[in-house]
């Protein structure tokens, strides 16, 4: 198994019932695999995954790590829509994230190597993040609310000059955490 693969199983019914779809890598459209976009439970056997409520890796993002999710509330879903998924691109276990107040890496900057449940509690002056840089090996999840709540966005190694680069509608970020439960 390569460092970017894993196994995730989607079920149409709650508690792992009904038709299922097993995925081992990028899947840009569940319907192309003969599976409807209704997902009510998920089992992640290996890897960490980014799931989207629309095909082509669009829409609301959900970060799922190894474990069982017997209904969509367990992955913070608002409904049973799921259209695409891909494994998190991780390279190892060194984590480093820089957050920037302004677009294009301007304004206040703060570095993180550990999870942070409330950015303002660490000295971040605002509740917005307009840009970030991900260094090292690991991936991070950015949350719109404190304590790892609200909409979530995955950022992998690279530069994100604007919140649009991580597919957000706004710069509102209040907590961050590392994706650590990979295998």
Curated annotation (Swiss-Prot):
Keyword Repeat carried by entry: yes
Domain Beta/gamma crystallin 'Greek key': residue ranges: 6-46, 47-89, 95-136, 138-180
Name of encoding gene: crygn
Pfam families found in the cross-reference section: Crystall
Function statement: Crystallins are the dominant structural components of the vertebrate eye lens.
Organism: Xenopus tropicalis
Lineage, opening ranks: Eukaryota, Metazoa, Chordata, Craniata, Vertebrata
Domain of life where this protein originates: Eukaryota
Keywords: Eye lens protein, Repeat
Family from the record: Belongs to the beta/gamma-crystallin family.
Protein name according to UniProt: Gamma-crystallin N
Quaternary structure annotation from Swiss-Prot or TrEMBL: Monomer.
Domain characteristics, as noted in the entry: Has a two-domain beta-structure, folded into four very similar Greek key motifs.
InterPro entries from the UniProt entry: Beta/Gamma-Crystallin, Beta/gamma_crystallin, G_crystallin-like
């Amino acid at each position: 198994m390569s460092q970017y693969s894993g196994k995730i199983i989607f079920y149409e019914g709650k508690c792992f019932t009904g038709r299922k779809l097993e995925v081992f890598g990028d899947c840009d459209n569940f319907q192309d695999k003969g599976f409807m976009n209704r997902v009510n439970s998920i089992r992640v056997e290996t890897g960490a995954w980014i799931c989207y409520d629309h095909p082509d890796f669009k829409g609301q993002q959900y970060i799922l790590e190894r474990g069982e999710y017997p209904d969509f509330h367990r992955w913070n879903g608002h409904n049973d829509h799921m259209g695409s998924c891909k494994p998190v691109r991780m390279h190892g276990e060194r984590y480093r994230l820089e957050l920037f107040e302004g677009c294009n890496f301007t304004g206040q900057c703060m570095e993180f190597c550990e999870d942070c449940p409330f950015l303002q509690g660490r000295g971040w002056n605002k509740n917005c993040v307009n840009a970030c840089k991900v260094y090292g090996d690991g991936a991070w999840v950015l949350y719109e609310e404190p304590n790892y709540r609200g909409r979530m966005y995955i950022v992998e190694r690279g530069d994100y000059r604007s919140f649009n680069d991580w597919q957000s509608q706004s710069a509102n970020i209040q907590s961050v955490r590392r994706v650590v439960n990979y295998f």
